Amino acid sequence: MSGKIEYISGPVVKAELPGARLYELVFVGEIKLFGEVVRIQGEKAFIQVYEDTTGLKPGEPVERTGEPLSAWLGPTIIGKIYDGVQRPLRNIEEISKNPFIARGIGYDKAPPLDLKAEFDFKPAVKPGEEVYPGDVLGSVKETEPMTHYILYPPLPEHAPGVVEWIADGKYKVDDVIARVKTKRGVVEVKMWHKWPVRRPRPFKEKLPPVEPLITGVRTVDTMFPIAKGGTAAVPGPFGSGKTVMIRTLSMFAQSRFIIPVLCGERGNEAADALQGLLKLKDPSTGRPLLERTTIIVNTSNMPVAAREASVYMGTTLGEYFRDQGYDVLVLADSTSRWAEAMREVALRIGEMPSEEGYPAYLPTRLAEFYERAGRVVLYGSKERVGSLTIAASVSPPGGDFTEPVTSNTLRFIGAFWPLSPRLAYSRHYPAIDWLVAFSRYVDTVEVWWSKNVSPEWRRIRDALQSILVKEAELQEIVRILGTEALSEYEKHILNVAFMIREGFLKQDAYNPVDTPSAPIKQFLLMKAIYTYYEEGLKAIESGVPASVLRELETVKRLPRLRMEVTNDVAKEELTKFIESLVAEIRATTNRRG
């Protein structure tokens, strides 16, 4: 079960390792560095090492483990901060006595779960009941907002059976909490189990994503929505607001569990994001957001190979909580760094490069990642539903959206929120370019908006989007001929588009009144602007100039409403405002008439 190192090239080690399997976890060298077999040629194995290989030399041993890189899943996972291979960073800091991660710290020294922690276990089944893989056996209260459900793991070796023994009481995470008698023998179930990170967890059926994931960001929720179980990408160059966007989603998205994966970002930026996440309060409960969050951090100065593992690790943790019946959101920042790590390892093991040096299987890996999202009927005997939503930022060099990572990502996602440097530099945040962005979920979430907010939602949303497109066309004329060449109708279009941009699309992420924006507030803000557009058209037909309409007191207030009206009084306040807006425009029309 062991071999010897033959040569070392950065994070890649070639070793003579008879019997090795693809993606098997191995320990490299005398200090036992984490590694994973990524290519096999005869008796030779190419290993990507998840730790710094400095000081390794040919001839040192390589030990096989016989199992793939796996996530440890069970209580004490919530609130943890892990590295890319699920080692808890706080524990590593205590062991290392150093802000940098010491090498050779394995799961024996820093286990991902606190196996000695005790919890009050409450059974959900009784002795004699039949259970299937994926069924809930019981639960423990891990944090105030999160109940941790203990599953009969859907592992290949587990078969349906009858509960032989289960009892409530105080148990350690590593204790046996149930025994299930199957045709293959008696299975002892503990509170935790392992799952290979590259293998998607099973489910019965994939359902269409029909319920929107409300994020509190108006541009996202109304114009380019994402559904629970959907996928989204946030590409943008440096300084365009990707990290703030990810922070806003992590704080306000209406998911029960959130997993931010900071993959290959700058250390200082990751530290700032971490400090911010640790201080954040859950707006719905007022308790620390960390009580329903697990964070994975893999900064750019950490070993490059661990970036790839971090994305798979985050997705596996997300699937685990999805299997408990929760709506889960995985936020990856950024997949470009993940792809760069893939490129470096592929080139070092001698694989044929494709476009811009990326491996030919880049589209396949991106598809495997995004396709793990979904709203699904869960494995087990009872009808349960859970969802895993994936939103990932992309960092294209120079903001070039035609580069391979961005262009291939476009093939597999349902919502595209590109960040424009032009908008960011003009201090328009979130800097989502409404002329390039798209969402494939508008049709599927329309039923939810019609039922829960207003049947007019789709009609008004489409009208506002058309006005923004028309504005872009008119701006070309204005640049050449000026506004004097425009008709009153066209001037009105420009005025309305300004209101949409300033009073609806723009949003201050740090203003508690402006962010988050409740669905009813979003709709009524949109309706107020659309009312200005509709009533304004009638006034212009009656001879009222667009410039007069723009100077009305209620119209002047339109861009400020988002900052003045809170979510709890939005329905009453904005309904009154729309009535006063209609009254003032009609009064002006009557006077001019």
Curated annotation (Swiss-Prot):
Binding annotation for ATP: G236, P237, F238, G239, S240, G241, K242, T243
Gene Ontology terms for molecular function: ATP binding; proton-transporting ATP synthase activity, rotational mechanism; proton-transporting ATPase activity, rotational mechanism
Subcellular location(s) of the protein: Cell membrane
Family matches, as Pfam families: ATP-synt_ab, ATP-synt_ab_N, ATP-synt_ab_Xtn, ATP-synt_VA_C
Gene Ontology cellular component terms for the protein in this record: plasma membrane
InterPro entries: ATP-synt_VA_C, ATP-synth_a_Xtn, ATP_synth_asu-like_sf, ATPase_F1/V1/A1_a/bsu_N, ATPase_F1/V1/A1_a/bsu_N_sf, ATPase_F1/V1/A1_a/bsu_nucl-bd, ATPase_F1/V1_b/a_C, P-loop_NTPase
Topology class, membrane: Peripheral membrane protein
Catalytic activity: ATP + H2O + 4 H(+)(in) = ADP + phosphate + 5 H(+)(out)
E.C. code: 7.1.2.2
SUPFAM superfamilies from the UniProt entry: C-terminal domain of alpha and beta subunits of F1 ATP synthase, N-terminal domain of alpha and beta subunits of F1 ATP synthase, P-loop containing nucleoside triphosphate hydrolases
Disulfide bond positions: none
GO terms for biological process, alphabetical: proton motive force-driven plasma membrane ATP synthesis; proton transmembrane transport
Family: Belongs to the ATPase alpha/beta chains family.
Role, per record: Produces ATP from ADP in the presence of a proton gradient across the membrane. The archaeal alpha chain is a catalytic subunit.
Subunit and interaction comment: Has multiple subunits with at least A(3), B(3), C, D, E, F, H, I and proteolipid K(x).
PANTHER family in the record: H(+)-TRANSPORTING TWO-SECTOR ATPASE, V-TYPE PROTON ATPASE CATALYTIC SUBUNIT A
UniProt name for this protein: A-type ATP synthase subunit A
